[in-house]
Amino acid sequence: MDASHAVNVERFIFLGSNCIYPKNCPQPIKEEYILTGVLEPTNSAYAIAKLAGIELIKSYRKEYARKWISVMPINLYGPNDNFDLESSHVFPALIRKFTDAVRNNSKTVTVWGTGKPRREFLHVDDLSKAIILCLDKYDSKEHINIGTGTDLTISELANKIAEISGFNGEIVWDSSQSDGTPRKVLDIQKITNLGWKPTITLEQGIKSTIEWYLENK
């Protein structure tokens, strides 16, 4: 941010995360629910860093009259994601596990947790369009949510990816692993009022991401 300020960048977007919201937050999550409860312990350090970024944006706006903004996207996925099973998020991890299982003719796929938590996913191309819209139409010190407004269980997601990838074996749930936050779905009224809405369905996104992974990994 200091470097951008030094060269007089007029429009700057801080890309935050839905992790800024409390673990047991009312659903759907409105922007004003920030700092109203305890964060999810497993990623609190990451969330605190994002919260600090939001405050920095507010400070630059106040002190230097910068037209800088903060956006909070939900879980993202798509081409060029991190598919490393040791460090990836749930969506790319499931893409890799099921496509690799089909390649290797494996009969089972193990997935962490119980499959019960509910999550919301947004394709990165839809995020790009939302960011461009915000650069043009949004100018506020308050952050803005970007998501789809709909969610599903991790179990439902796993079954969709299994079906689209062609996996016909058994899904084994490892309940010894943490489920994390029970539910995350964003209230996206602010951004829909600006004229934006997601255009890529989950099924379309899964299919195109699998195709990208198979061609590039």
Residue ranges and their predicted role:
Residues 6, 11, 19-77, 81-87:
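Catalytic helix-loop patch of NAD(P)-dependent Rossmann-fold dehydrogenases
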Residues 13, 19-28, 65, 99-107, ...:
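Proline-centered turn/helix-capping motifs that create local helix->coil transitions or kinks
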Residues 16-17, 72-73, 148, 187:
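A secondary-structure boundary/capping signal
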Residues 51-58, 62, 91-96, 128-129, ...:
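Conserved active-site helix of classical SDR/Rossmann-fold NAD(P)-dependent CH-OH oxidoreductases
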Residues 100-217:
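C-terminal substrate-binding subdomain of Rossmann-fold SDR/epimerase-dehydratase oxidoreductases
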